[in-house]
């Protein structure tokens, strides 16, 4: 029986999950909820379902896999990672995965705060000024390894790919100073299942954010 992934009909926090489902060849169905236009941004599609799914903490995204019902995007990724041995094999690898999971969320929040800001144009130059220092940390953490935890891919690579790709969409040249990050992106996109997924109609690279955002809402 396929699992069900519920989320808004955007990229958002669902992107890394969709990529991981595809990579692991997990049979899944999507419930994509649409949000209405301004000024009301009607959420009734989701609200009509929200308290009918028996979720402990009703929220989007959610994953339903038989009797297992998981919310919180990183918890979903960890759940899938455990099922498919993609959480790191050594203690050092698991530590690196733990660090990346939290670091990516920090990076994601910083970009989201900018893109949802009414002062987007005013704040954008400062964000771009600090971006190389942020990306340098990822570059140094990756080093010469093929994947962020080591020689084998983990669910953390799906998170890092997602957030780096969002930044590349925002500022196309931002990775040019970091050849190892560019190689990582190409390596990830070259994975057989990922490459195939990106050619399908299921692939949803945008909109990155919901309709209230100033950037990434289309």
From Swiss-Prot:
Location of the protein in the cell: Cytoplasm
EC number annotated for this UniProt entry: 2.5.1.18
Primary subcellular site in the record, as a coarse category: cytoplasm
Enzyme class (EC, first level): transferase
CDD domains, per database record: GST_C_Mu, GST_N_Mu
Gene that this sequence comes from: Gstm6
Residues that, per the record, bind glutathione: 7-8, 46-50, 59-60, 72-73
InterPro entries: Glutathione-S-Trfase_C-like, Glutathione-S-Trfase_C_sf, Glutathione_S-Trfase_N, GST_C, GST_mu, GST_superfamily, Thioredoxin-like_sf
Protein name: Glutathione S-transferase Mu 6
Pfam families: GST_C, GST_N
Catalysed conversion reaction: RX + glutathione = an S-substituted glutathione + a halide anion + H(+)
One GO MF term: glutathione transferase activity
Domain GST N-terminal per the UniProt entry, residue ranges: 1-88
Annotated signal sequence range: none
Domain GST C-terminal as annotated: residue spans: 90-208
PROSITE patterns tied to this protein: GST_CTER, GST_NTER
